[in-house]
Every structure is written in C-alpha cells, then in structure tokens.
Amino acid sequence: MVFQSFILGNLVYLCMKIINSVVVVGLYYGFLTTFSIGPSYLFLLRARVMDEGEEGTEKKVSATTGFIAGQLMMFISIYYAPLHLALGRPHTITVLALPYLLFHFFFWNNHKHFFDYGSTTRNEMRNLRIQCVFPNNLIFKLFNHLILPSSMLARLVNIYMFRCNNKMLFVTSSFVVCVRMLLVEWAFPLFQLFLVMKV
C-alpha cells in the first residue's frame, strides 16, 4: 500500500513537471503562434486556389514564401523586443503602408497599363507579376495589427516574459512546432507535386 502510494505520488509529480515544463509551454504557444489566423491568410488562399498552370504554380510558391517570411518576422518580433516595438509603432506602419497602398491602388489595379512596356517579352512581364505577389503577402502579414488587430501577439509576449525562466528552450520548442507545421502543410505537398511532375 505504501509502495503504491509512493509510485502514484512520483507519477503525479512527474506529470506535473512535464506539464509545467518549458518545452510543453513552448509547444503550446508555438501552436498558438502558428494558428493565429488573420486577413493575410486570404491572400495566401487566393493564390493557392485561384491560379492554375505554370504561372499559377509560381504564384503559389511566391505567395507561400512571402507569407512564411511575414510569419517568421512576426514570430521573431515576439522574442525580440526592438522589432516588436518597431512593428507596433503607428509611424512605422504608416511608413510601410503608404507606399504599399499607393503602389497597390494606382499601379497594380491598373495592371494592364502598368505591365504594358511595349518592347518587353512575355516572360519578363510574367516574372514581374509573380514578383509582386511576394511583397503583397509579406507586407499584408505585417498589416494584421493595423487592419484587424489581434491580441494574440501581446498575450504571447506577456506570457513569455513572465512564465519561462529558460527562454532559449522555450524559443526552440516553439520554433520546432512552427517548422513542423510548415513541413506538413506546405513543403510536403510541394515535394509530392514535384515528384508527380517528374514522372
């Protein structure tokens, strides 16, 4: 009887240590960081669903790369306070947003005239359209705080600052979850598509 209560007590203690460990907390908040859905997912979804053909595949890769770069910048801003403060200031967002909005509304919406250079080849114009998809997804990911603000980033920063003593292990475990999601969601289907196209 004493031996069973000793084993049960040690098992409960071990479970509590595992649940309250930095790795589990990092994995949990890594999931929250990965799944914080905002309006930037609409651009990614548009590029992945609507475009077809060779140009569509290149746009999908460009949109996914821009989205991942924006997600990585937001993820780094959680753990790097100067970047978090820079992205949170209204003047920084204005400096980023004004040229983007001017370009987007005056040139991109008028793309028939904007891409009509006269002496350029079709591939050069197509490459310019594909290259414009990358900054569109990257910058719009940073605009999440301006357009539809979410308290997810602020909560993660506060919990990170007050919860964990071993900050490097927390960052590593959070990053492992984000990389795993990236591999499962985007890299593996692209690899399958590559294998199908080779055969």
Curated annotation (Swiss-Prot):
Transmembrane segments: 22-44, 65-87, 91-108
Taxonomy, superkingdom: Eukaryota
Protein keywords: Membrane, Mitochondrion, Transmembrane, Transmembrane helix
Localization (cell): Mitochondrion membrane
UniProt signal peptide: none
Main location, first listed in the record: mitochondrion
GO cellular component: mitochondrial membrane
Membrane topology summary: Multi-pass membrane protein
Family the entry assigns: Belongs to the ycf1 family.
Note: A stretch of 270 kb of the mitochondrial genome is duplicated within the centromere of chromosome 2 resulting in the duplication of the gene. The expression of this duplicated gene (At2g07739) is not demonstrated.
Protein name: Uncharacterized mitochondrial protein AtMg00370
Organism: Arabidopsis thaliana (Mouse-ear cress)
